Amino acid sequence: MAPILIALVSLISYATTATKQTAPTKTESVAQSRDTSADLEAIGSVIAKYAKSIDSADTSLASQIWWDSPEVSFIHPLGHEHGFDQIKANVYTRLMGETFSERKLTPRDITIHVYGDAAWAEFYWEFNAKFRKDGKPIATHGRETQIYRKMQGNWRIIHVHYSGMPTTQPGQGL
């Protein structure tokens, strides 16, 4: 739990934010700007691999982007997974692999924030799939936050939280 807390504290404690939408501030050096740009690109690549890992229910690909630790977590409408073993078993194998015969996750409107060796991203997504049992299609839309930590030069996912889109009907979504 300590590494995740360190990453979360790092996210809060840094005074400057680098995102895909902002240019370097006057106080940033050119080297810092290049590092941040490279980090934004690397995290964008992690998000693309994440979507591909969901599309193919591929735990090997997931192993390249997740921190293999009992301290990572994944919150989703059907549960809360603790540790990469649970994420592989319950999200990738059971939910994605056994529930759906086809899957396509499309992230959009991605915003990435880098704070040293910690980062987070938020995005909206569209998920299209077919149920394995009867071939019926399903299309859902939602939003997601991912938290990352840079370890040995590589960005790794340490936490995911996703949910459906907000509801606007009275008495719902509370």
Model-derived segments and their meaning:
Residues 127-133, 148:
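Beta-strand elements of well-folded, non-transmembrane domains
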Residues 117-127:
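A short hydrophobic beta-strand element
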Residues 16-65, 171-174:
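Short, low-complexity N-terminal intrinsically disordered segments enriched in polar/charged residues
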Residues 41-42, 59-114, 124, 139:
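A solvent-exposed, acidic/Ser-Thr-rich amphipathic alpha-helical stretch
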Residues 34, 133-139, 167-172:
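A short acidic/glycine-rich loop-to-helix N-cap element
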Residues 1-13:
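Bacterial N-terminal signal peptides
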Residues 66, 125-127, 161-164:
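Short beta-strand segments enriched in hydrophobic/aromatic residues
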Residues 22-25, 120, 141-168:
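Short beta-strand edge/turn micro-motifs at domain boundaries
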